[in-house]
Amino acid sequence: MSSQYERELRHVLAGIPDGVEKVIRSCTVDEKERMRMVLKRPFLVVRAAGSGIEGSGDLLALRGDICFPIEVKTTRARKLYLSGRTLDQYNALVYEGERCGLMPLYAHRLKGVRGDSWRIFRVETTTLSGSLGVLARRIPSLPRTRNGRAFIDWEQGMPLNEFIQIVCQQDPSSPTLGFL
């Protein structure tokens, strides 16, 4: 994982105007509008210490209403099969998600694509409640091979602009995701 792309995602989720504008240059007008929603409801995004080890993910996105550990992957290939170290990272994310009631995410950036090149996937956990439980139903989980092993398929992920639209919607009656 290149820190350049990790930084790119960090700047978008943190609502840094220059970072958002850089990422949306080749997006459609609708995608740009959705991505800019993060400017009004940004996250505090920190790089996780020991990134990728013990289920921490690469980034931790925090806001008063939600929190996500995010594992960032960047490839030229549309599919990434998890094995070895990447499978260990996945298993650790599942464990920590279950243990702490979190919804870990994978963010996959496909190199060489115009428009929204990021896709978001959810790591399946069973301990989600409240607004995270509702949100989980809207975000696709990692697909499975015929043997049942999780893998990343860029085509099956949620575009980042749609993810931002969901988590950054403003409901005047509630500062949380209760409106989902």
Regions found by a protein language model. Give the residues of each.
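Acidic-basic catalytic patches of nuclease active cores, encompassing PD-(D/E)XK
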Residues: 1-50
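Conserved catalytic cores of phosphodiester-cleaving nucleases, focusing on short active-site segments
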Residues: 13, 59-61, 65-76
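Short, basic, glycine/proline-bearing loop/turn elements
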Residues: 41-44, 72-79
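Histidine- and/or cysteine-centered catalytic micro-motif in compact active-site loops
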Residues: 50, 73-75, 109
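Beta-rich catalytic cores
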Residues: 55
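Nucleic-acid nuclease catalytic cores
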Residues: 94-128
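Intrinsically disordered, low-complexity terminal regions enriched in charged/polar residues
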Residues: 117-180
